[in-house]
A protein has these predicted regions:
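Accessory nucleic acid-recognition modules appended to NTPase machines
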Residues: 1-100, 104-108
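Generic hydrophobic alpha-helical scaffold/packing signal
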Residues: 79, 83, 104, 115-117, ...
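Short catalytic-loop micro-motif centered on adjacent basic/acidic residues
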Residues: 91, 113-116
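Structural motif
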Residues: 110-112, 140
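Catalytic cores of nucleic-acid endonucleases
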Residues: 118-159
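Domain-level recognition of nuclease-like catalytic cores that cleave nucleotide substrates
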Residues: 147-178
Length: 178
């Protein structure tokens, strides 16, 4: 079935933000996306939470059984903050499913993968993109998590609440040379 009209209505009504799939994690972003492959994020994470059943909403308020929803909620929160900072949303998923990155930003000369981690993980996809010679536009990445600000192995870590500062940081950014 074709849902294009419904999706366009949700976008035009300001209910969802669209995140397009990149054909390859390379520049330019807008010329490198497949408009038929996309994810939708709510413009207001409260709308996402309101769609949960009452028991699940109670779980969120009492901070239990959060692991089921945590990834989707944090990813939606970051998507919302990026859009409000003026970014268009792009993600990448390799057809084999072995590599997936949540978002991409652009600096003057680089493509920056952004990974949203709900749990402490090893950021396998982010590390693969940074270390691969195949993606020359990618020199470093950003990881958003519950952790503090940090840097290790070409990955800059920021707490979720710093998402709105990424645009300002990106403009004055000078990569650390390892």
């Amino acid at each position: 079935r074709d849902y294009r009209g419904c999706v366009e209505w949700l976008i035009d009504a300001g209910i969802v933000n669209v995140c397009y799939c990149l054909s390859s994690p390379t520049l330019p972003l807008s010329g490198n996306c497949d408009v038929d492959k996309f994810k939708l994020y709510f413009c207001d994470t409260g709308l996402l939470v309101s769609l949960l059943d009452e028991e699940s909403q109670d779980d969120l308020r009492s901070n239990k059984n959060l692991s089921v929803y945590k990834g989707a909620l944090y990813e939606n929160i970051v998507a919302e903050a990026l859009v409000k900072s003026g970014y268009k949303l792009y993600y990448y998923r390799k057809d084999s499913g072995t590599l997936e990155e949540d978002f991409f930003l652009r600096t003057a000369s680089n493509l920056v993968p952004v990974e949203v981690k709900a749990k402490n993980g090893n950021s396998k996809s982010l590390r693969a993109l940074i270390s691969s010679d195949k993606y020359s536009d990618i020199e470093f990445g950003f990881k958003l998590s519950a952790n503090n600000i940090g840097y290790q192995d070409k990955i800059y870590t920021f707490p979720y609440f710093c998402t709105f500062l990424l645009k300002k940081y990106r403009k004055t950014f000078v990569p650390i040379k390892d």
